[in-house]
Every structure is written in structure tokens, then in C-alpha cells.
Design a protein with these regions (language model features):
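Extracytoplasmic
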Residues: 52-54, 167, 171, 397-543
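Active-site lumenal/periplasmic loops and adjacent helix-entry segments of GT-C-fold
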Residues: 23-208, 215, 241-245, 420-421, ...
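Hydrophobic/aromatic-rich transmembrane helices and adjacent perimembrane loops
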Residues: 245-247, 357-382, 392-393
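Transmembrane alpha-helical segments
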Residues: 117-125, 204-218, 248-257, 318-325, ...
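Short hydrophobic alpha-helices at membrane interfaces in multi-pass membrane enzymes
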Residues: 213-234
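Transmembrane catalytic cores of multi-pass membrane glycosyltransferases
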Residues: 227, 236-337, 344, 353-358, ...
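Signature aromatic-anchored transmembrane alpha helix within multi-pass, membrane-resident enzymes
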Residues: 270-281, 380-408
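Aromatic-anchored segments of alpha-helical transmembrane domains
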Residues: 23-27, 142-148, 233-238, 276-287, ...
Length: 543
């Protein structure tokens, strides 16, 4: 291993080419959606299956008007601005300045982030790995590798899962339990899962920069470096508040190993203390905002990551790390304490369920140190990457990117039944009618699938908007579904009680049954559904 390797100086042409390819891969889903969209249809920019894209699209527009800290429009309860969304504020402002839609600014920004993350990962691998084959093996494994969860996902989706009881009991039923998922099904736990996801590319980049700044401050100690590390920790926490806990877990794990090995005890203690203070300061600021908002802290918890699922996420890397751990630790200095501490911090947090509410956040960035240490163990002693080793790598890491490519290909294909991805002229007319009539405090009631395409351009509030941001979401969502399934006899009472002004009913929910509701007036009708406006005062005036 190198004692004083370069970081970004002298990056080879191949690394730049790889970064450009990664950036192009980020653009492919949107490019394909644009190509397959029929005349008259608009690509919204949401070619992902995640409902969070609706949330981000709302924030891009809302933050441009309200500022980098926004109020919560996904719930009916009054609240003061408390959600820090600086990234979406920048996206919205760039969109306003350029005239490009926020979604396309978001996608192009993601391409830049993908390129930067690729260069950062390459530079990090080069810093810790001196042998060229080890470097490229680690780099490619991090950027496009995964685990064996792709096989499980494929098996679960296949007819075999329904034809054989043993497959159902071993795979289908366990993964059908609430909040049980392999890493392949999560958005940001692998780099390859994040390549088409601008949001998680940003988080990966900020978290990795913060961890590397922490290491640099220890290695080349100065108070300026300490300050930069603290700022990096604070910045990553502002971008995604969960990362603050992950970063502190890494920092304290590195510090513990350095103390055990009697390596730079003062330096690691000083840097850890500064970074801890920075993260706590951000937590305090966000806590103050939430406390003043008038809304409770959301009760949502992330999915637990079981030890076996974590092993299946990186099986080859875990085997190599455990195989060579004793020697790797015995010969280690600061660099090895840092990488092992990084692994330990992420792993402990990942396996902290049920006590820590968001354990899946610990996986983010784990792939980098785990893969680098695994490569160092394998190539120690001049081992070669022969055809058999390459085949094993592909077998144990290749299912994830294959499944991800297939999912992205499917999700970016045209579907006239998914207006959150492709807006028809009728859909755009419905949105225009809603925006013409709506005020900022008006409440919209719509089914889950319809919120995904109505929400981004809607300036008002939602009765049941988002699983994390809506107060008492489960109850409100269930009430929405019950109302849409009902015979509409209690619709007027429900709409009045919850001060709902706009009510969208898709064709699949039979909007005709709501035409007899007193005060519920069709505002805009298409073949796909009816946008109603509830005007109880008109009913009182007619009575």
C-alpha cells in the first residue's frame, strides 16, 4: 500500500472515460423515456418507481418560491417552514434562471454527480491500493457490482416461486413480510442502484467526501483540516439528516481502533470531537425547526437489515475480509484502522435494529471500504485475477446490476396508465385546471397513484400526501381508499370535516357515483377521470 499516494492529481485517461460512461448511464432512462414517448405525451422526469420522486419534484418548485427551508405541503395541519432542502432550492433556482424544467435540471445535475462520484471512488481506491489490477478490480466492483440478492429477487418474481412450496417458504414468504427487503430492492445501498438516482448520488458524494475529509484531517493534522472535516460532516447531515448518525458511527469506530493501536490518539480525538460537535449543531438546528413547525416527529422507521441479508449483499467481500482480517489488522497502520473503522461503523449501525429507527442508512458507503479491503486481501502476495476469479466475481456480484438494468428498462418504457411518468394532453389539462383554481391553502384529496402526477405542479396541500410527511398518514390514506370505494353517501360529510376543496376521482374508481354529492361540482373532466371542486356554500345557498 502506498504511503503518500495522490488523490485527484494525475488521474489516468481511463478513469475519466469511465466517469463519462457512468454519467451517460445516468442519463439513459430519461433518454429512453423521451424516445419512446408518443407525440403529445410529456415525459415528467419521474422514470423511477419510487414515490419519493413526487416529493422531490414538489420541493424543486416549492423551494424556488419559499427558500431553502420549506413548509410541509403533504399534510393538512398548519405548519411553519422546517424542512431543509438546499439541493432542491438550487435545482429550482437554476430552472427559473434557465427556463429548463426542474426535472431536466435534476437529471443533468445527476449526470455531473455520477461523474464526480466515479472519479472520487477511483481516487479513493487508488489511494489505498498500489497494484493496478487491484485498483481497477475494486473500482469496477464498487461502481457496478452488487451481491446475490438479484437472484433472490428474480426467483421471487418467477413462476417457480408459485409452483414449489419450498421456494415459497424459503424466499417468497420471508420477503413478503413488511419491511423485509434484500439490498437490491433498496434505492441507495449500492452505487449501481444509485447511478440513475440523483438524490442518492448526492448523498453518496457528500458522505464519502466527509469520511475522506475526516481521514485527511487525522493523517495531515492541522486546525484548517479539522475545520474542513467538521464542515463536511455538517454539510452531509444537512443534505440528508440520517447521514449524521452514520458519519459519527464511522468516526467513533475509527477513533476506537486508533486508540487500540496507539496511532495518532490526539489527532483522531480532536477531529472526532470537532465532527461530533458539527453534527450535533445541525441536529439541534433541525430539532429547533421541527419543534417550531407545529408538527410531530414522523414515526416512520426504516427497514431492518438482517445479518444474513447484509452478508448476501456483499458475499465475496465479506469472505475475503474475514479470511485475511487477522493479517490485515496485524500489519495495519492508520490507513487500515481507517478502512476497518469505516466498515465497523457502517456495519454496527446497519445491524442496530430494532433500537435505531433507520438502520438501512448504515449500508450507504459501506461498499467502498469493504471492497477496498477485500481487494487488498486478495491481491496481497501477488495473487492474479485469472479467468476463474473473474467468473466468481461475476457470479457473486453480477446479479444486482442485471436486475437493476432490467428494472430501469421496464420503468422507462412507455405506459399510458402511468401519468406520473408520461403525461397525456388530458392529464396536462387537468393539472392546468387545478392550478388555475387552487390557492396555497386549498386541500386536494386523491388516490395514491393520482397524487404521483397531480402533486408536483399543485400549489396547495394534500390530505394524504406522503407516507413520511403526512401526519397520521396510514389513517388518512385508509380513509381516502375507503371513501373512493364507498357508495359516496358520506362524501359530503368527509369533505366538509377535512376542509377538502379538490377531489380527483380516476375512471377506475367510478367518478359517476360522486356526481350526486351535494356541493361537489365537476371542475374538469377527461376520459381518465374527473377533478371535482367541493363548494358546500353553493349547496347552502340552493337549499
Amino acid at each position: 500500500m502506498r504511503t503518500a499516494p495522490r488523490f485527484f492529481q494525475g488521474l489516468p485517461l481511463a478513469a475519466w472515460v469511465a466517469a463519462l460512461v457512468i454519467a451517460a448511464l445516468h442519463m439513459l432512462p430519461m433518454a429512453r423515456a423521451k424516445l419512446v414517448a408518443p407525440d403529445g405525451y410529456t415525459v415528467t422526469g419521474n422514470v423511477s418507481s419510487s414515490p419519493d420522486l413526487m416529493q422531490y419534484r414538489v420541493w424543486m418548485r416549492q423551494a424556488a418560491a419559499e427558500g431553502p427551508v420549506v413548509s410541509n405541503r403533504f399534510t393538512t395541519e398548519p405548519n411553519r417552514p422546517y424542512l431543509p432542502v438546499p439541493f432542491y432550492y438550487v435545482i429550482g433556482k437554476v430552472s427559473q434562471a434557465t427556463g429548463v424544467t426542474p426535472e431536466w435540471v435534476y437529471v443533468w445535475t445527476g449526470a455531473v454527480l455520477a461523474m464526480l462520484l466515479s472519479l472520487l471512488v477511483f481516487a479513493t481506491a487508488r489511494y489505498f491500493l498500489s497494484e493496478r489490477t487491484a485498483l481497477w478490480t475494486a473500482f469496477l466492483s464498487i461502481m457496478i457490482g452488487g451481491g446475490v440478492g438479484g437472484y433472490i429477487v428474480t426467483l421471487e418474481r418467477s413462476s417457480i416461486a408459485h409452483d414449489f412450496t419450498i421456494v415459497q417458504r424459503l424466499f417468497t414468504e420471508p420477503l413478503a413480510q413488511p419491511m423485509v427487503e434484500v439490498l437490491d430492492e433498496l434505492r441507495g445501498d449500492y452505487v449501481v442502484n444509485s447511478l440513475a438516482d440523483t438524490h442518492f448520488l448526492l448523498i453518496w458524494l457528500f458522505a464519502t467526501v466527509a469520511i475522506l475529509a475526516f481521514y485527511r484531517a487525522i493523517r495531515s493534522f492541522s486546525w484548517t483540516a479539522v475545520g474542513l472535516a467538521a464542515v463536511s460532516f455538517a454539510g452531509a447531515t444537512v443534505v440528508h439528516v440520517y447521514e449524521g448518525v452514520t458519519l459519527l458511527a464511522v468516526a467513533f469506530s475509527v477513533a476506537a481502533l486508533c486508540w487500540v493501536r496507539r496511532i495518532k490518539r490526539f489527532e483522531v480525538s480532536a477531529v472526532t470531537a470537532a465532527c461530533t460537535i458539527a453534527v450535533i449543531a445541525v441536529f439541534a438546528w433541525i430539532g429547533l425547526l421541527v419543534g417550531r413547525s407545529g408538527l410531530p416527529v414522523p414515526p416512520w422507521r426504516g427497514p431492518p437489515i438482517y445479518p444474513l441479508l447484509l452478508f448476501l449483499g456483499f458475499p465475496l467481500a465479506w469472505v475475503l475480509v474475514f479470511w485475511g482480517l487477522a493479517r490485515y489488522w496485524r500489519e495495519g497502520g492508520l490507513e487500515r484502522c481507517f478502512l476497518l473503522g469505516w466498515i465497523i461503523g457502517c456495519t454496527v449501525l446497519t445491524l442496530s435494529a430494532p433500537f435505531y429507527p433507520w438502520p438501512n442508512r448504515g449500508v450507504l458507503s459501506l461498499q467502498i471500504p469493504l471492497t477496498i479491503v477485500a481487494a487488498a486481501v486478495w491481491f496481497n502476495g501477488q495473487r492474479k485475477l485469472d479467468a476463474r476469479a473473474i467468473a466468481v466475481c461475476i457470479l457473486l456480484m453480477g446479479s444486482t446490476p442485471v436486475v437493476k438494468v432490467m428494472d430501469r428498462w421496464k420503468s422507462s418504457g412507455f405506459s399510458e396508465t402511468q401519468p406520473q411518468k408520461f403525461l397525456s394532453p388530458d392529464d396536462r389539462a387537468t393539472i392546468a385546471a387545478l392550478n388555475t383554481a387552487a390557492r396555497t391553502n386549498d386541500v386536494l384529496l386523491a388516490d395514491f397513484d393520482d397524487r404521483l402526477w397531480l402533486a408536483p405542479d399543485y400549489r396547495g396541500r394534500h390530505y394524504a400526501g406522503h407516507f413520511f410527511l403526512t401526519v397520521d398518514y396510514d389513517r388518512k390514506h385508509a380513509e381516502t381508499v375507503d371513501l373512493l370505494k364507498s357508495d359516496a353517501s358520506r362524501a359530503a360529510e368527509f369533505l366538509t370535516k377535512n376542509q377538502i376543496r379538490f377531489f380527483y376521482v380516476a375512471k377506475r374508481r367510478d367518478p359517476s357515483k360522486f356526481r350526486t354529492v351535494p356541493g361537489l361540482v365537476p371542475l374538469h373532466e377527461t376520459a381518465d377521470g374527473v377533478l371535482f371542486e367541493y363548494l358546500p356554500a353553493r349547496t347552502r345557498g340552493q337549499s
